[in-house]
Amino acid sequence: MVAVSGTQHTRTVSPTRWIVYAGSVFAGAWLATQLFYLAQIALWSFVNPGSTAFMRTDAWWLSRDKPPAQIQHQWVPYDQISRNLKRALIASEDSTFATNNGYDVDAILQAWEKNKARGRIVAGGSTITQQLARNLFLSREKSYIRKGQELIITWMLETVLDKERIFEIYLNSVEWGRGVYGAEAAARYYYRIPASRLGAWQSARLAVMLPKPRWFDAHRGSAYQAQRAAVIARRMGAAELPQSE
């Protein structure tokens, strides 16, 4: 018997090919995520969101730290929320909401300069639509990557939904204290009335809370809240609501 010897060749993969492969996987995952967000938003054109990313995170922490506690949230239709609260939020959070495209370039640039001066992210320059994008899908983490994703989701919201629907979802999902979400829950938690009965002064005080709802919940009746509420109350008359209002 004659033995035949041969040479075995080991196939190596170049680093460039690995980089291309990894990049393709990352791009595919990123695209799938964006399509998921877009599909969810399209569904919410006619179906109300059951919960948000913020609510789910809060529910987990409450179940761990305060087992009996639960998220307080009750969806109510747009026309069952006081116009006072709508005007107060626009006056406080996004005065051009009815006419802008979801972005306030001046506010974003101002936030950029402020963050650069501080050496860290302390401001975001977010419109109502940007806040909604963050609440629905993202986290409270402050990073430029999260901000970039927020801007993309904002574009999706503004493209798929009309302004009134965006505002309706916002009003029903924004946080007003730990475990307190939406106008109805906030009105009952702080004033023991439905959101439809909120007066101008009550609405102004609720609007003040939005940047730091948990802090204001723990420091009710602060002098700053009263002063800021007075400023918002004066601006409410000029607040422009979405066209159908």
Swiss-Prot record:
Question: What does the record give as EC number?
Answer: 2.4.99.28
Keywords per UniProt: Cell inner membrane, Cell membrane, Cell shape, Cell wall biogenesis/degradation, Glycosyltransferase, Membrane, Peptidoglycan synthesis, Transferase, Transmembrane, Transmembrane helix
Q: Which GO biological process annotations does it have?
A: cell wall organization; peptidoglycan biosynthetic process; regulation of cell shape
UniProt membrane topology term: Single-pass membrane protein
**Pathway(s) the chain acts in:** Cell wall biogenesis; peptidoglycan biosynthesis
Q: According to the lineage, what is the superkingdom?
A: Bacteria
Q: Which reaction does it catalyse?
A: [GlcNAc-(1->4)-Mur2Ac(oyl-L-Ala-gamma-D-Glu-L-Lys-D-Ala-D-Ala)](n)-di-trans,octa-cis-undecaprenyl diphosphate + beta-D-GlcNAc-(1->4)-Mur2Ac(oyl-L-Ala-gamma-D-Glu-L-Lys-D-Ala-D-Ala)-di-trans,octa-cis-undecaprenyl diphosphate = [GlcNAc-(1->4)-Mur2Ac(oyl-L-Ala-gamma-D-Glu-L-Lys-D-Ala-D-Ala)](n+1)-di-trans,octa-cis-undecaprenyl diphosphate + di-trans,octa-cis-undecaprenyl diphosphate + H(+)
Q: Which residues cross the membrane?
A: 20-42
* EC class: transferase
Q: Which GO terms describe its molecular function?
A: pentosyltransferase activity; peptidoglycan glycosyltransferase activity
Role noted for this protein: Peptidoglycan polymerase that catalyzes glycan chain elongation from lipid-linked precursors.
Q: HAMAP family annotated for this entry? A: PGT_MtgA
Q: What is this protein called?
A: Biosynthetic peptidoglycan transglycosylase
| Organism lineage | Bacteria, Pseudomonadati, Pseudomonadota, Betaproteobacteria, Burkholderiales
